[in-house]
């Protein structure tokens, strides 16, 4: 029986490239030159932003989002934490979310069932496997999932006949 997996993954190499591009953009901007920094921690998938003022942090977040989108990474995976003061500097953390949590998996399964397609959806850890009798049914399921916006970017992989 044909099947495919619904996942939410990040290409860590592309994220690294996006952060490096954001650092270059930060150096290019006259209003932010030498006043802020990005620090990417690959293991925790976090980006620490440091700046002198709150408005500079907001501009840096926009630069980071723009860099992610240019590298074809959905900005929805970015979770921005609250800014806090640390001495003379303002700091903020941006966490990159990866994987489908149980709540989102339940929403995906419910959406597939509500679409009344001839497919079955099963939660398997951080992914959802969708199985059907025909390839056309699976393509309809993909179209239904793409039409609805979830709070995480979804990818479809492991398509098997």
From Swiss-Prot:
Transmembrane helix keyword on record: no
Highest taxon of source: Bacteria
Entry-linked SUPFAM superfamilies: YajQ-like
Keywords assigned: Nucleotide-binding
Cellular component aspect of the GO annotation: cytosol
A molecular-function term among this protein's GO annotations: nucleotide binding
Transmembrane segments: none
General function of this protein: Nucleotide-binding protein.
Family: Belongs to the YajQ family.
Record-linked HAMAP family: YajQ
Protein name: Nucleotide-binding protein PFLU_4927
Organism annotation: Pseudomonas fluorescens (strain SBW25)
């Amino acid at each position: 029986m044909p099947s495919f997996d619904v996942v939410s993954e990040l290409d860590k190499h592309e994220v690294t490239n996006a952060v490096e591009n954001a650092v270059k953009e930060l150096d290019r901007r006259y209003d932010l030159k030498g006043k802020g920094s990005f620090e990417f921690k690959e293991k925790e998938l976090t980006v620490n932003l440091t700046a002198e003022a709150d408005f500079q942090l907001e501009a840096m977040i926009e630069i980071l989002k723009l860099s992610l989108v240019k590298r074809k990474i959905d900005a929805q995976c970015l979770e921005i934490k609250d800014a806090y003061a640390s001495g003379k500097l303002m700091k903020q953390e941006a966490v990159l979310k990866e994987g489908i949590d149980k709540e989102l998996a339940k929403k995906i399964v419910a959406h597939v069932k509500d679409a009344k397609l001839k497919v079955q959806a099963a939660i398997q850890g951080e992914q959802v496997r969708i199985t059907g009798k025909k390839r056309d049914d699976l393509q309809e399921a993909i179209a239904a999932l793409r039409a609805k916006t979830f709070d995480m970017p979804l990818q479809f992989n492991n398509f098997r006949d």
